[in-house]
């Protein structure tokens, strides 16, 4: 018989640097999960990724206080900022543009995020990423 699911916890944790401090500790502690066990497992799974990259993680907590977790790809905004070499997006994206990004790079990001996105096809996912780029003040060039 399958274990009874007690809760789902969604967090964004930097790759390779999960530790018991907030937000990880309090979120897992109130559900009775072994925090250090999660931190060690998460850091082991993300050790090959770029250090400090924000990784969305969904933790499934079971009634016996055991857990499983699933990592997702980094947020599109983070991937766009690193691809364009920016520190942050534009505070006024409609009037103040902060950089440019090639359409080929946007499509590459869409293909990377395809597993986590619910788009019908790669073109739709690419358009979605282009919209995110525009809302950050990036100009998408051919």
From Swiss-Prot:
Keywords: Methylation, Ribonucleoprotein, Ribosomal protein, RNA-binding, rRNA-binding. GO terms for cellular component: cytosolic large ribosomal subunit. One or more lysine residues are methylated. Gene3D superfamilies: Ribosomal protein L11, C-terminal domain, Ribosomal protein L11/L12, N-terminal domain. One of its GO terms (molecular function) is structural constituent of ribosome. SUPFAM superfamilies: Ribosomal L11/L12e N-terminal domain (SSF54747), Ribosomal protein L11, C-terminal domain (SSF46906). It comes from the Bacteria. PROSITE patterns: RIBOSOMAL_L11. The keyword RNA-binding applies. GO terms for biological process: translation. InterPro entries: Ribosomal_uL11 (IPR000911), Ribosomal_uL11_bac-typ (IPR006519), Ribosomal_uL11_C (IPR020783), Ribosomal_uL11_C_sf (IPR036769), Ribosomal_uL11_CS (IPR020785), Ribosomal_uL11_N (IPR020784), Ribosomal_uL11_N_sf (IPR036796). PANTHER family: 60S RIBOSOMAL PROTEIN L12, LARGE RIBOSOMAL SUBUNIT PROTEIN UL11M. NCBIfam families: L11_bact. Forms part of the ribosomal stalk which helps the ribosome interact with GTP-bound translation factors. HAMAP family: Ribosomal_uL11. Part of the ribosomal stalk of the 50S ribosomal subunit. Interacts with L10 and the large rRNA to form the base of the stalk. L10 forms an elongated spine to which L12 dimers bind in a sequential fashion forming a multimeric L10(L12)X complex. Belongs to the universal ribosomal protein uL11 family. This is Large ribosomal subunit protein uL11. The lineage of its organism: Bacteria, Pseudomonadati, Pseudomonadota, Gammaproteobacteria, Alteromonadales.
């Amino acid at each position: 018989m399958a274990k009874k699911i007690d809760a789902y916890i969604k967090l964004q944790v930097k790759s390779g640097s999960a530790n018991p401090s907030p937000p990880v500790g309090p979120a897992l502690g109130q559900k009775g999960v072994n925090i250090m066990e999660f931190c060690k497992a998460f850091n082991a799974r993300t050790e090959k990724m770029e250090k400090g990259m924000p990784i969305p993680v969904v933790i499934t907590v079971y009634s016996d206080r055991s857990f499983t977790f699933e990592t997702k790809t980094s947020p599109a905004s983070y991937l766009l900022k690193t691809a364009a070499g920016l520190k942050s997006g534009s505070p006024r994206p409609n009037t103040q543009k902060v950089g440019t990004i090639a359409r080929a790079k946007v499509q590459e990001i869409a293909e990377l995020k395809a597993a986590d996105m619910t788009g019908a096809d790669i073109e739709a996912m690419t358009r979605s990423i282009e919209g995110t780029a525009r809302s950050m003040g990036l100009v998408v060039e051919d």
